[in-house]
């Protein structure tokens, strides 16, 4: 724990808490909309935002009113999420140049990124973040260096000492407070506050400070009030946790006065940390925010995004109303409305039991017999309005009946169905682009954190081709490039089925054929991999092994003596060495590689000369070769 001057500490705590309260009050209207969105998604659809600044549930106008919920919002959001979940974490590091060392460094960085994505279970985090983003409009990732992760490298009085590793977490929009709600770009904010409720024991374990706990609303992050109003909505956003304390982390971006930025961490009335931004995670080795923002839809002039649910709430209310009025009309048709003369029957009995089948109805002699009023039929306008609202659901949400129910007409061609599916996917382009850019930024921050903290040699276990395990030792100096590119353009449009069809067409056209009109073994393996059938026995493939050996020799040129082996595949080695030769600028290395290539060509000539008589069925001395039994 860092010791701070008493007066200095009190001033910092007071300033941070005052700034936090101001930002929370400014953001309250947006937070109410998020709560309303969550209620409609969960089925609490008879709620509204009141003028007093709360979300409350309004009651029935009459006791007999139908108040059922026909939740189309949930199915629309779930359909969008199922499509967003098809996005993969396929990303690669682009080398600085075509130099073999840069290429190998980029490959190592790519393997590290993939390993970190697997260790942090990034696909699961993406699904969780997408759920928050679709309902509230925004979500955030936080990428930090966790000292309690990684392999054990020693021990101390407090326990095992670990080497540390990257940690990625999903941060709901309730926990992020920008200094200006009108700034749309996260990096343009002068400061960002991340406020989260921690248990007091967890605060003591992390920062070594004891703070006083209280009951805290984990979403609004204020002290929980006792009791709820009569019309309060029983939603999950009013969850109250006990023995908690709100930890406020205020990140200030670098300025001319403070080139390394500033971070202040406050819990209760205690200052836990005050100093420079801890992570070199920005471009050009600068310090920046450890956050990444993703959105559902862009909201102009606002830091947070907007959710598709906000557009669907009026339609959902209208749909619930039309369905309930329709069922009320059906109830009148089925049970009827009885007309009786005053005092002719026992009305109490009728109200209690109704007109049950076989009921003996006794009425006063001489009075008009009870009769059912004519209710007519259900107005056709009800049906028209219901169909119109359903079509508006499709228009506004961008999710068609094809995506939700597969209700495809028989006369539609496969091409037409494909166009409809492509149109549905196109309407998700804003969310998919934001998610892809979020993945890229998270991976960039992971690499930059490794470059900052991997000072000594570290070992990483990778999943190689065909699932085999590969081990690599590296340091920060081995991770030069953080220029990331996606392996696929877009998984929603560039699907596996589209790839397979394209590859099959290219094979038919002979694009993969060599000069002899056949497909090489290497191309066969690549084709099988693209088709999703796996890179069959690639780790055991002889050609691939020769190619890897030649690439390793390219790196070893100039460092150690590289000899030509009799078992080398000379054609493959010559091709790989020629690539290095054409890219090399050092004259001494050019001469060294040239001599090495000449040795391969010489041994290749000798091998070919030895094979010619064998192909004719003759021995070296000209005599016929007679096979023995």
Stretch-by-stretch model annotation:
Residues 1-629:
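Extended alpha-helical, oligomerization-prone segments that build pores/tubes and scaffolds
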């Amino acid at each position: 724990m860092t010791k701070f001057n008493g007066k200095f500490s009190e001033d910092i705590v007071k300033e941070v808490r005052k700034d936090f309260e101001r930002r929370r009050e400014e953001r309250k209207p947006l937070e109410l909309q998020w709560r309303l969105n969550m209620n409609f998604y969960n089925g609490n659809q008879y709620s509204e935002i009141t003028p007093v600044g709360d979300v409350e549930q309004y009651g029935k106008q009459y006791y007999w009113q139908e108040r059922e919920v026909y939740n189309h919002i949930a199915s629309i959001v779930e359909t969008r999420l199922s499509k967003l979940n098809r996005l993969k974490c396929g990303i690669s590091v682009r080398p600085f140049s075509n130099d073999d060392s840069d290429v190998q460094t980029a490959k190592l960085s790519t393997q590290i990124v993939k390993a970190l994505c697997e260790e942090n279970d990034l696909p699961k985090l993406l699904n969780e973040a997408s759920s928050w983003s679709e309902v509230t409009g925004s979500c955030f990732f936080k990428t930090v260096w966790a000292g309690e992760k990684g392999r054990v490298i020693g021990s101390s009085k407090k326990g095992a000492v670990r080497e540390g590793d990257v940690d990625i977490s999903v941060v709901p929009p309730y926990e992020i407070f920008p200094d200006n709600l009108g700034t749309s770009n996260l990096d343009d904010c002068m400061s960002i506050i991340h406020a989260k409720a921690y248990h007091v024991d967890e605060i003591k374990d992390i920062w070594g400070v004891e703070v006083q706990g209280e009951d805290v609303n984990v979403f609004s992050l204020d002290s929980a009030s006792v009791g709820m109003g009569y019309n309060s909505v029983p939603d999950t956003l009013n969850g109250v946790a006990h023995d908690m304390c709100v930890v406020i982390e205020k990140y200030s971006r670098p300025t001319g006065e403070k080139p390394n930025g500033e971070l202040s961490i406050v819990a209760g009335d205690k200052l836990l940390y005050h100093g420079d931004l801890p992570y070199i995670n920005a471009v050009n080795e600068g310090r920046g925010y450890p956050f990444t923002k993703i959105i559902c839809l862009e909201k102009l002039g606002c830091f947070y995004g907007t959710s598709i649910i906000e557009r669907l709430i009026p339609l959902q209310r209208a749909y619930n109303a039309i369905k309930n009025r329709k069922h009320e009309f059906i109830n009148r048709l089925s049970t009827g409305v009885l007309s009786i003369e005053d005092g002719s029957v026992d009305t109490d009995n009728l109200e209690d039991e109704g007109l049950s089948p076989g009921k003996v109805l006794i009425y006063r002699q001489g009075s008009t017999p009870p009769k059912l009023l004519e209710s007519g039929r259900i107005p056709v306008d009800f049906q028209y309005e219901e169909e119109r609202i359903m079509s508006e659901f499709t228009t506004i949400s961008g999710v068609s009946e094809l995506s939700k129910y597969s209700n495809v007409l028989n006369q539609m061609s496969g091409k037409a169905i494909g166009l409809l599916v492509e149109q549905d996917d196109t309407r998700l382009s804003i969310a998919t682009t934001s998610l892809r850019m979020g993945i890229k930024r998270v991976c960039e921050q992971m690499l930059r954190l490794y470059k900052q903290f991997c000072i000594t040699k570290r070992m990483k276990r990778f999943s190689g081709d065909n699932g085999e395990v590969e081990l690599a030792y590296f340091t920060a100096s081995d991770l030069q490039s953080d220029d990331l590119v996606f392996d696929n353009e877009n998984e929603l449009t560039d699907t596996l089925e589209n790839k397979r069809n394209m590859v099959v067409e290219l094979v038919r056209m002979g694009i993969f054929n060599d000069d002899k009109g056949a497909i090489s073994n290497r191309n066969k393996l690549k084709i099988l991999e693209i088709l999703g059938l796996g890179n069959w026995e690639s780790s055991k493939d002889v050609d691939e092994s020769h190619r890897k050996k030649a690439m390793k020799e390219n790196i070893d040129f100039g460092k150690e003596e590289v000899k030509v082996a009799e078992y080398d595949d000379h054609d493959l080695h010559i091709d790989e060495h020629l690539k290095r030769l054409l890219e090399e600028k050092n004259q001494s290395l050019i001469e060294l590689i040239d001599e090495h290539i000449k040795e391969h060509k010489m041994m290749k000539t000798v091998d070919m000369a030895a094979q010619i008589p064998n192909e004719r069925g003759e021995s070296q001395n000209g005599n016929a070769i007679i096979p023995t039994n």
